[in-house]
Amino acid sequence: NVHCWDDQQANNPDSDPAWRGDFKGLIEKLDYIKALGFSAIWITPVVTNASGYDYHGYHAFDFSTVDVRYESDDVKYQDLIDAAHEKGMKIIQDIVINHTGNFGEATLAPMFTKEYNTLKDLESVNCMVPIPDSDFAKTFPDYDSLAPGYQYQARLNIMKDTKALDSGDHDTENNYHHYKDLSWESPTVQTGQIAGDCVDVNTENPKVAEYLNTVYGDYINMGVDAFRMDTEKHVSRLTLNQFYFPSWLKTGGKNFYVFGEVCTRVSEFWNHNIPAISAPFYTWAETDSKYINALGDD
C-alpha cells in the first residue's frame, strides 16, 4: 500500500484504486469462470478495511462486517455465495487472523468510525473519525492537527501500548502483541509486525481467539466452503491447532478445507534454522489428529 513513483509520473491520485471489483461483477462472470474449467473461486478478504489503498482486504478495520465497497444496493456477499453454489461452484474466502490495519479494529481496538455519505467519500482517509470518549480520543484530542507520522505513532501508541507519545496504560486486555520489532524473517516473526500497516494481533489470547472464531464461524455458516489463511507462518502452529482449527472444523465439518500462506524469503529448507517458522513445520501430514478425530464423521 504505497504511492509508487509511477503513480506520480502518471498523475494518479493518492486515493482508492479501482482494482477491487465487487460481488455483482463477479456474479456476472461466474458462467465465464466455470467455462474455463474452474470449480472454485478464491476471493480476497471481504472484511471491512479502513480506506484508500486498503483495497485488498488485508488491513482489517472490522472483522465482523463485510466491506461496503464490495457490495451493491441489490447484491451482498450472501448473494455471491448462493449464486456460486447454484452453479456447483465453491467459494474460498481469504482470511487474516495475524494482524489488523493500523486504524484499530471495531472490537479489539475501537478507535475510529467511518463517516461518509457516498462510497466515493471512502476514497480518502479523511472519512476516518476518532470515536468520541474512546481511549484514543481522550489520549490524543489534537489528533487531527498532528503530522501524518505522529498520527501513525499515536495509533500504535494505543494499539500496542508503545508509550511513544504518552505514558498511559493502553490495550490492557493485551489484544495485540506489544513487541516493537518489524520483520518478516526473525525469531520474533510471530510476535512482531510484518509491516507498518499490519499490527500484530495477540492470537494466543483466548478472548481474541473467541472473537475471531465467532466472526469466521459466521462466514462458514453463510456457506463459505474453505479458508485460505494469509500470513499463516506468522501465527504459531501450536496456537492454530489449539485455538482456531478445532473451532472452524467444528462449525464447518470435519472436511472443511483450510490452506495458508507459509511464505519465506530465503532458499533454505529450514528458515534460518528455525523449524517453527519453516514451511515443513506447517505441511507435515498428521495421521493422528486428536481434534479432527474427535469431530466424528459429521
Where are these regions (language model features)?
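Active-site cleft segment of glycoside hydrolase catalytic domains centered on the general acid/base Glu
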Residues: G192-T203, R237-F245
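Short, acidic/polar
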Residues: W19-Y32, V201-N221
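Short, solvent-exposed turn/loop segments enriched in Gly/Ser/Thr/Pro and often Arg
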Residues: N1, W42-Y53, I95-G104, T231-S236, ...
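Active-site-proximal helices and loops of the catalytic beta/alpha 8
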Residues: L80-G88, N98-H99, M111, P132, ...
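N-terminal structural segment of carbohydrate-active enzymes
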Residues: N1-K90, E105, G192-C198
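Aromatic- and acidic-residue-enriched segments that line the glycan-binding/catalytic groove
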Residues: G52-S64, N98-W184, N273-P280
